[in-house]
Amino acid sequence: MTYKRVLLKLSGEALMGDKPYGIDPAIVQSIAEDVERVIANKVQLAIVVGGGNIFRGLKGSADGMDRATADYVGMLATVMNAISLQDGLERVGVETRVQTAIEMQEIAEPYIRRRAMRHLEKGRVVVFGGGCGNPFFTTDTTAALRAAEINAEVVMKATKVDGVYDRDPNKFKEAKKYSSLTYQQVLSDEIAVMDSTAIALCKDNNIPIMVFDIFKKGNISRAVAGESIGSLIS
C-alpha cells in the first residue's frame, strides 16, 4: 500500500550524519534524492524538521537557561534546518515551500493550513519550521499536530535507529525490536520513541506512526510504498 499524503518527521540529529554538530550536505542530498523519488510517484509530502543538531531546548534549560527562552532558540534552529533542506530539495528539482509557526516573512511563508494543503495538492513539498510556535512542545508533537491538520495518513519518524526497541539498542545488546505495537503500549511502557503528547495526539486522531532508519539510502521511498522496514505504531 502506497500512502498518498505523508508527514515525514526528520530529527535534527539525522541531518548531522557523522558530524558532531550542524548539517552534513551529503545527508541532505541523500534525503533530497529520496524525496524526489517519492514526489515522482505523486505522493504528497510534508516535512517537520527538528533542531537538535544545532540547539536543543531541553539541554539549554538543563544548563540554566529559562525553559521558554531555550525552546524559542530551538525553534530558530529548526528554521535553519528547514531552509537548508529546502535548498537541497530544490537542487534536485523538487519544488519546496517553507512555512514557519513564527513569522519570518523575508525567508519563509507563515504557517497557514489551507495554503499548506494547496501546496501539497500542487505537488510541492512543504517543510514546517519553528515547531508549533509555542515553548514546552517538542517537534515530535508538532509533527503529530501538523499531520492531523493536513489530514496525513501516517507520521513517518526518520531517525538514527531502525525501529522501536524495548530499551536503548546502543546500550543493551539484548534489546528487543518491535515490528508493531500499539499507542497504549508505548504510553504504558514509557517507550522512548516520541513524547507522550505526540503519541496521544496520533492516537486520538488515529494516525499511525512508522519509525525507521534514515541513514539507509532509499528508506523514505520504501516506507512511503508501505514496505515493512521499521516499526509501526497504531
Swiss-Prot record:
Cross-referenced InterPro entries: AceGlu_kinase-like_sf (IPR036393), Asp/Glu/Uridylate_kinase (IPR001048), Uridylate_kinase (IPR011817), Uridylate_kinase_bac (IPR015963)
Main location: cytoplasm
Keyword Lipoprotein: no
Residues the record lists as binding UMP: 51, 71, 132-139
MF-aspect GO terms: ATP binding; UMP kinase activity
Residues binding ATP, per UniProt: 9-12, 52, 56, 159, 165, 168
Localization annotation: Cytoplasm
Alphabetized UniProt keyword annotations: ATP-binding, Cytoplasm, Kinase, Nucleotide-binding, Pyrimidine biosynthesis, Transferase
Pathway(s) per entry: Pyrimidine metabolism; CTP biosynthesis via de novo pathway; UDP from UMP (UMPK route): step 1/1
A cellular component annotation (GO) from this entry: cytoplasm
Protein family membership: Belongs to the UMP kinase family.
Function recorded in the entry: Catalyzes the reversible phosphorylation of UMP to UDP.
Subunit details: Homohexamer.
NCBIfam families assigned: pyrH_bact
Official protein name in the record: Uridylate kinase
Taxon lineage: Bacteria, Bacillati, Cyanobacteriota, Cyanophyceae, Synechococcales
Gene: pyrH
